[in-house]
């Protein structure tokens, strides 16, 4: 029996009603300690229990080797303090951040809320982090302490104090500090929790950012852009065009949504207000279908030429398979992992292997875009 899913999670979410941000802080501290003691008995037990290695799940994409397609989404390890632990928890890659050039406290608390009835979370964190320089220092130390077995991405955001017209330089300053320490990089212009940030998805604004980054990117690190689920098809098509123009490694689809339709939660206990009255982005199950629609659209528009990392509402092997067959080469989890617990990654990987066997596939790559291919 999965003790976390059936006992600990319901207790924390529905009975004790622990503050989600406090619980997250304690968890990341524990993971940070484990990350700094890579040969510990605890790490060995975690790896044995939670990891699954199978050549059918391996892929080489944009020059990087991924042992499996399930990654940790940005937002959990904002400062890269636990970068060395994620492979032991079964992940095939992990994305650190979002990190900004200037350290910043984020938005006032409370700013993170669980919506158990919807299997969702609402957050308005506001890119709280210690800054790019602090992350760089930590990752240099991490490289000395352990050898990462999985690709590590770094998600870059705009500092709140930086005016929108200076955003490109702000992203560039962070990239310069971190470019030798991450395996791939993500331009986050889609969080709803930094004033004006989503306007950077506009073609002219985004073009300026990508142009500066690629000029600096002499070692050809893979660069992605992460987009919002709330964009219309025309705006997404413009971003696809920019991805081709600036030779991006791919697109991450999607960030959290500002939509509130269909939610079962009437009142958030911490504030006494409805989700409709609270600012922030919704993640988890309510995002699942829309993020898959965006993945499908990108695949159809590009015929699979631009790799997609799919994220949003993944809780089960079926959810993961749906994202992959819609066109995602890789997937990321966060909210689902919080609800389902640490065994979720292994369960998804086992489920994907079963799907491959059922379809007579030798590699997970054969499943990417299968839904669209089969309709031709």
UniProtKB/Swiss-Prot annotation:
CDD domains: DHOD_2_like. One of its GO terms (cellular component) is plasma membrane. The keyword rRNA-binding does not apply. GO terms for biological process: 'de novo' pyrimidine nucleobase biosynthetic process; 'de novo' UMP biosynthetic process. InterPro entries: Aldolase_TIM, DHO_dehydrogenase, Dihydroorotate_DH_2, Dihydroorotate_DH_cat, Dihydroorotate_DH_CS. It catalyses: (S)-dihydroorotate + a quinone = orotate + a quinol. Its cofactor is FMN. Pathway: Pyrimidine metabolism; UMP biosynthesis via de novo pathway; orotate from (S)-dihydroorotate (quinone route): step 1/1. PROSITE patterns: DHODEHASE_1 (PS00911), DHODEHASE_2 (PS00912). Its EC number is 1.3.5.2. Keywords: Cell membrane, Flavoprotein, FMN, Membrane, Oxidoreductase, Pyrimidine biosynthesis. It is a peripheral membrane protein. Pfam families: DHO_dh. FMN binds at residues 74-78, 98, 155, 188, 226, 254, 284, 313, 334-335. The active site is at 191 (nucleophile). The keyword Membrane applies. SUPFAM superfamilies: FMN-linked oxidoreductases. Monomer. Belongs to the dihydroorotate dehydrogenase family. Type 2 subfamily. This is Dihydroorotate dehydrogenase (quinone).
């Amino acid at each position: 029996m999965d003790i976390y899913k059936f006992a600990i999670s319901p207790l924390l979410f529905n009975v004790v009603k622990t503050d989600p941000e406090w619980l997250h802080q304690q968890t990341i501290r524990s993971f940070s300690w484990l990350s700094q003691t890579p040969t510990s008995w605890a790490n060995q037990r975690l790896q044995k229990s939670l990891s699954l290695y199978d050549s059918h799940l391996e892929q080489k994409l944009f020059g990087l080797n991924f042992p499996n397609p399930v990654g940790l989404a940005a937002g959990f390890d904002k400062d890269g303090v636990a970068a060395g632990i994620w492979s032991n928890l079964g992940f095939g890659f992990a994305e650190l951040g979002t990190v900004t050039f200037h350290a910043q406290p984020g938005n006032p608390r409370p700013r993170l809320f669980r919506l158990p009835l919807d299997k969702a979370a609402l957050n308005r964190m506001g890119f709280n982090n210690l800054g790019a320089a602090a992350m760089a220092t930590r990752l240099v130390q991490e490289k000395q302490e352990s050898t990462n077995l999985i690709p590590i991405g770094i998600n870059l955001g705009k500092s709140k104090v930086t005016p929108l017209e200076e955003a490109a330089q702000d992203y560039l300053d962070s990239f310069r500090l971190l470019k030798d320490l991450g395996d791939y990089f993500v331009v986050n212009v889609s969080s709803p929790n930094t004033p004006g940030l989503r306007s950077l998805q506009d073609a002219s604004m985004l073009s300026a950012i990508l142009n500066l980054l690629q000029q600096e990117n002499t070692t050809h690190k893979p660069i992605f852009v992460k987009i919002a689920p709330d964009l219309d098809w025309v705006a997404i098509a413009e971003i696809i065009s920019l991805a081709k123009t600036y030779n991006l490694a791919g697109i991450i689809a999607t960030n959290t949504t500002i939509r509130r339709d269909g939610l079962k939660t009437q009142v958030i206990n911490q504030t006494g207000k409805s989700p409709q009255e609270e600012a922030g982005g919704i993640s988890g199950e309510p995002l699942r279908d829309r993020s898959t629609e965006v993945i499908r659209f990108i695949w159809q528009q590009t015929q699979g030429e631009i790799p997609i990392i799919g994220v949003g509402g993944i809780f089960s092997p079926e959810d993961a398979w749906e994202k992959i067959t819609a066109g995602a080469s890789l997937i990321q989890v966060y909210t689902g992992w919080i609800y389902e617990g640490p065994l979720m990654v292994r369960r998804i990987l086992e489920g994907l292997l079963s799907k491959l066997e059922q379809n007579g596939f030798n590699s997970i790559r054969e499943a990417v875009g299968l839904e669209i291919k089969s309709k031709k």
